[in-house]
From Swiss-Prot:
Location(s), subcellular: Nucleus
Biased composition range(s): Pro residues: 10-21
Similarity-based family: Belongs to the SDS3 family.
Gene of this entry: SUDS3
Entry function: Regulatory protein which represses transcription and augments histone deacetylase activity of HDAC1. May have a potential role in tumor suppressor pathways through regulation of apoptosis. May function in the assembly and/or enzymatic activity of the mSin3A corepressor complex or in mediating interactions between the complex and other regulatory complexes.
Keyword Repressor (UniProt): yes
Natural source organism: Bos taurus (Bovine)
UniProt protein name: Sin3 histone deacetylase corepressor complex component SDS3
Amino acid sequence: MSAAALLAPAPAPAGAPPAPEYYPEEDEELESAEDDERSCRGRESDEDTEDASETDLAKHDEEDFVEMKEQMYQDKLASLKRQLQQLQEGTLQEYQKRMKKLDQQYKERIRNAELFLQLETEQVERNYIKEKKAAVKEFEDKKVELKENLIAELEEKKKMIENEKLTMELTGDSMEVKPIMTRKLRRRPNDPVPIPDKRRKPAPAQLNYLLTDEQIMEDLRTLNKLKSPKRPASPSSPEHLPTTPAESPAQRFEARIEDGKLYYDKRWYHKSQAIYLESKDNQKLSCVISSVGANEIWVRKTSDSTKMRIYLGQLQRGLFVIRRRSAA
């Protein structure tokens, strides 16, 4: 039998209903639809299985994460407890490291403090020695100055006493008590015997100095010149002293003080300047001007360091003459 005969439909029997017509395209479509449905069901089943497995895996991972987190917490807690125990025992490495650093800082500060204390102590000792030397020097200077002032004061009193003695010698004759000249009459027979008159000797007059030394000396020289020639003058009177050109009353010198300086004989003199001082008795003294006041100057002798006070009036009248050492 040929293939065409095999493929041809069999003839229907008689009296049978007619067979339906057969279309091969429709069968293929039905088969493809069934295949698609079966594949779709298979895919859905696979997806459901996959979803279930993923859910189980997620749950398992979450449990593992929680367990791992708990383990990390326990490890961290145990580490902290161990570090706390080491800290209490003093064996913690970080604690020892920081303690070593603090100890170094402490020793450094102690060393700096000791150096600062030593420096301050040396500075205080130097200041103490310096102040002590200054105090000793000031004490010695004040002592010398006090001694010089006392010597000058005593010299001044000595001069006043000598001037007073000289004044008493020059004016002694005027203070003598002269007897009263009375006429004696003859006593009558009936008159009582006269009682002698007892008179007290008048006390010597007291001298009150209201003038300066140079004015007193000038008055004494004037009185000495006017005194009577019958009474011999004492050798110590100014009349027997050798006269110098400086004692001439007609010769006067210009002397004044301005701005702490002395202007004398057309020259300026200042403090601490070396001079020669010539007095009325031809004494020539080497002196140094100690100070310049308002109306007088103080000079210090270089021989014994005693001080003398010279008034402007004495310089103007020529009782003392000042010359520079270089020009003298």
